[in-house]
Amino acid sequence: MRGIARRLSSGLPLPVLLLAAFAAWILTATPPTGFPILEYHMVTEPPRPGAEPYVVPPEEFAAQLDYLAAEGYTTITPQDYARARKGKQELPEKPVILSFDDGYEDNYRVILPMLKERGMKAVFYVVTNDIGLPGYMTWDNLFDMERSGMEIGSHTANHIPLTTLPPEKQREELHLSKLMLEWKGLKTIYSFSYPTGAYDDGIVAMLAEEDYLTAVTGEAGLNNVETNPYLLHRVNIPRPHFGLTEFRMRLMKADIAARLHVRLAQLPDGVREGITHLRTLLHGNQ
């Protein structure tokens, strides 16, 4: 008690002290093992009006790729991860997945050449009813991407948050998007990205029933073979304001979130559920 009194007498407000103690509690958790999945949307200049937060300038993206390479990261795809979970493939020492949502045309025009130049690969989650529309990739673009070693995944047929739909419509979005991509001649679609990151237990079960093997969320953290393959963590990479410093902080966010997962698992059920609910509310307001 005397120690607490001394800290309180230092002039720091109690909420600040509590927040500092909570942060220390998280950061002293056993360091998690796992790899990050990075979430991108567009890489182009100038950005679409109203889409600025989702657009990374090409020179910034190039610097991020070069940073990952310099730090020893090796790019893999969700299918590589799925094979590793089944013991059919070994992952590199320091893997990372680069993921791109929505299927914008710059994914082919700008991103693909930059990845090929560096011998990197990625997964591109496309909305099937947007393919070929102005501003989006064409079927020929997708075939060329696949030939270049990229993985194509589903982002549903219409990009509607699945939790807003009745179960039969949810299944249509999962089934028809996968069916269309495969019917057009792409390889079997195994990976999925939840529109706006929205999911529930029923949707997760449907993905398995529809023969998907992995799905990515919008929740930060690290991933390993013990992670639920339908609840893979991702770190959003928005338009940066502080260059590589901000990018490094985003990677650190995945580590901190993973440590939080470790600590939450150590709490009583009621406390853990309360904190998880609060995190969900905060995530929805970002």
Q: In which residue ranges do the predicted regions lie?
A:
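Short histidine/acidic/glycine/proline-rich micro-motifs that form metal-
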Residues: 128-132, 161, 195-198
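Short, glycine/acidic-enriched loop or turn micro-motifs at the edges of active sites
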Residues: 104-105, 158
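Histidine-centered catalytic micro-motifs
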Residues: 38-39, 151-159
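Short beta-strand and adjacent tight-turn residues that come in two discontinuous sequence segments
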Residues: 125, 155, 215-217
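C-terminal active-site subregion of NodB/CE4 polysaccharide deacetylases
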Residues: 2-4, 11-15, 19-99, 105-106, ...
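Acidic (Asp/Glu)-rich catalytic clusters
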Residues: 112-120, 137-154
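Charged helix-capping and loop-helix junction motifs
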Residues: 135-142, 169-173
